[in-house]
Amino acid sequence: VKVVILAGGLGTRLSEETSVKPKPMVEIGGKPILWHIMKMYSAHGVNDFIICCGYKGYTIKEYFANYFLHQSDVTFCMKKNSMEVHKKRAEPWTVTLIDTGDDSLTGGRLGRVSDYIKNEKSFCFTYGDGLSNVNITDLISFHEKHGKDATVTATYPPGRFGALEIKGNQITQFTEKPKGDGGLINGG
């Protein structure tokens, strides 16, 4: 199973971070959101990724081009212009990076990577800026069992503000950022 990850949007709500990098490259715990998403899939044995690059996509390409170097212990001999790798840390991933355009929308990005998934029985398709605790193995099994064209993971959006319950002029309950209005949204 391959995973197609959307990583081309502008990320306007994180403008202080995304003025220099795409939103999937914003770091959590010293690693890009994109890395965390890929680790989640990899934990379920899914290691073949197609990244739909767009806005500042070169930063994603540079990240993966230098990934092995950054994850390994190395010695550089400046005199000989050589490098010796001591401890190698690598992921079992295959990562295909496709420039899908700066202004493409979801369908356009999927269309531009269609040649890379055309021989797949099914594939996973997710956003490059959302983390979850979805059991990927169970999700794929569910999809295969039901034999539909698509399976959508739904979630309740978090509320944006704390909610107060007031009786008379007294606060009787406070709930910090309750789940949204009860409507499910597409979680990827």
What are these regions (language model features)?
Residues 10, 102, 128-130:
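Active-site metal-binding loops of divalent metal-dependent hydrolases
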Residues 65-93:
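Short mixed-charge
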Residues 101-108:
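A short, glycine-/small-residue-rich helix N-cap motif at loop->alpha-helix starts
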Residues 110-122:
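Active-site nucleotide-sugar/metal-binding loop of Leloir-type enzymes
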Residues 120-131:
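Short beta-strand-to-loop acidic/aromatic patch adjacent to the donor-nucleotide binding site
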